[in-house]
Amino acid sequence: MKVLFVNGSPRKKWTTAKLLESAAQGAIDADATVKLVHLYDEPFRGCVSCFACKLKNATTNGLCAYKDALTPLLEKARDADAFAIGAPIYFGRASAVTLAFMERLLFPLITYDQRSTRRRAKSRSAGFRFTRKRPRPR
């Protein structure tokens, strides 16, 4: 089993990363092949609204058509049996880099045609971990 862990925090040693590392260790203990990726290491942008993934005869196979440093990671997510995304919460939402990743990961799978759906070759499990700073009880 291949499991991809995606860290959407700029900090590689803080809470979000530690949660993902702990989950990754559990996957390793269950004999999974694990890959942990830090989104802030990748120079990429969110969806550029080119709509190439929406063309009737698109050959993108559920992947974003825009090519940049994120393309190999999107391919890893497509090929994984399961993946988990971890992100800190900033201004009530996941970090901007996490949202940009999710746009590029999920938008190609959405269809505007009610008669058909876009599907990946296989279904997979996904998990999300969000962290935020909050005061400790006194």
Residue ranges and their predicted role:
Residues 96-97, 110-138:
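Short, glycine-/small-residue-rich phosphate/pyrophosphate-handling segment
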Residues 1-114:
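N-terminal beta1-alpha1-beta2 submodule of the flavodoxin-like/Rossmannoid cofactor-binding fold
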